[in-house]
Every structure is written in structure tokens, then in C-alpha cells.
Amino acid sequence: APSGYKSLNTANLTPPTITDGSKYFDVALDTGANILSAATSKTDNAGFIWIKDRANNSTNHILFNKVNDVGMDGTPHLRANTTDNEVTCGTYSAPSGNSVGWAWDAGTGNPVTNNDGSIASQVRAQPSAGFSICTYTGNGTGGASIGHELNDAVEFLIVKDRSAAASWHCQHSAIGNTSAIFLNSNSAAVSNSAYWNNTSPTNSVFTVGTADGMNGSGNTYVAYCFA
């Protein structure tokens, strides 16, 4: 190799943080009838599942997790393409066509109570993969914070109201802490301090404003955190 450079070979590469990504995130392809079991069998401890019928483009995206759905049978679930709450989404129904299921590992054991923030949260976390699932009850107070059980600051955050109709609010480090984008919409980022209180996540908590979509008083929420 030229002076000041190294040869391109695996011995000269920095060891990856995650050597086998399929331990923490994987994808299943199967019939609609079998996609639930196929997806939940992926990764070491599948704790978050996202299912979509590949054969029918008008069908819903089905999301569920092991904090709210201990048995991982798809009930309760939410739909990423709608504002519906868990009651409206109802009982899981298998897709009719060949489907895809994305699975994320969310750690082992029961959810833990996290009191790092001003609002207590129930959390399943896989810090090795930088992923956690948090559920909490809003208090309507701007600047309220919620613990996420990860070792690094959250880079991408998805929050959904489980108890009321609301959009899927997302914060990403690339767009900053003053705006949100929405899974269920094709609109551009919307700036509003009521979303995140103009505050970026830390290595222990994320912060919410007063908007009903993430902090309505008495409403229940789920947050998916990616560090």
C-alpha cells in the first residue's frame, strides 16, 4: 500500500459494534397465515414486530410489541399508516397475501420501570443494538422527560398515542428537536415546540412537549427508541 495508507483487508478494519446484525434485527417472508409466527421467531428475543401484506397494497401496516402484547399474538396492535388507537385497530387478523415481517430484538426478561425522567416508563431494551420500547402515561406538562434505558442518546424516536387517535410523531437527529415528521403522512417536517419542547434526547431520557400526540394528560403512549 502507498505510504500513509493500509491495505484493504479485514485485519485493518475497525471491529463492528454488532458483529451479527441478525441477532438483533431480521426479516421474515411467508404467507399471510404464517407471517406472525415466522416474524416472532426471528432474532434472539423479538420484542417489536412490523407486518405488511406484500400482495395487497391497500392493506395496513401492523405494529405490536412485547411490552403491550406479552404473548406477541398481535393484539393489541397499531397501524403505522393510520391515526387509529389500539381499540379501533382491534384484534390481529392475518394478512390474506404473502407478507413481510420485520423483527427487532428488545432484550430479555420483563419490562422494567424506569424513573430517570419526570414520567415513569415501562421499558424493554436491548442496549447492545441501541433499541428500546417505552410505554408511559402523559401528564400534559411541557418539558416532561421519559427514560429509555439505552446507553446513548436516541437518534430516531417514534411516538404513538395508544388510547386516542393521533399521528405517529417522529424525531430524528438529522432534522433537529424543533420539528416532527409523521409515519402516517407524506407531509414535510412540521415545526412546533409542543412536540419535543425543542429538546434533544440524552443518553438517559427523551423529552416531550404539550401536544396530545405525545403527552396528552392521562393518555397512554408507546415510544420506539433507536440510538
Predicted regions and their residues:
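Surface-exposed molecular-recognition determinants
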Residues: A1-A227
